[in-house]
Amino acid sequence: GKGINLYTSIYTTAIRGTIRHNSIYSNTGLGIDLGNNGVTLNDTGDVDTGPNSLQNFPSITSATSSTRVVTGRLSSRANTKYTVEIYSSPTCDPSHFGEGKVYLGAVSVTTNGSGVGSFSVAVLSSFAVGSKITATAIDPAGNTSEFSACRAAN
């Protein structure tokens, strides 16, 4: 099954579900699923509603093992400060979106007026070449995104 599933019922919508520093891996579904419907694709401006406000996930653009540097970007609400947490796993889910076996570190990302923020961070923990690197984004209210798509470390 899924690692963590946040969803809307007839009684309530799960919000402010902060998921931090966890080890979520080796399950048969997504590591984090907002809405109980598989990967929730990112949307421009991230103004939708639903479990954890359907917080957009970051995208990893590179992960370099020798320097422990991970780069990426987040497209979400404009002029907002987020925490991006970075993880590694030996494999990805069948969806090619991540899980998070090993917590590597976090970085603050502030989006611009268009809702885009970039990051480049030397994480605290090392990771091997070929490791699958993923990330989550946490908004100021504590809403955590699903894991990003996997990026193989070089």
Predicted regions mapped to residue ranges:
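Exposed aromatic-hydrophobic patches
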Residues: 71-73, 114-126
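Surface beta-strand/loop "capping" patches
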Residues: 42-77
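Beta-strand signatures of extracellular beta-sandwich domains
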Residues: 33, 83-87, 134-136
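Solvent-exposed serine/threonine-rich low-complexity stretches and specific carbohydrate-binding patches
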Residues: 99-114
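Glycine-rich beta-solenoid repeat tracts in large extracellular/virion proteins
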Residues: 2-13, 30-37
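Edge beta-strands of extracellular beta-sandwich domains
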Residues: 141-154
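Extracellular Ig-like/FN3 beta-sandwich strand-entry sites
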Residues: 79-81, 128-132
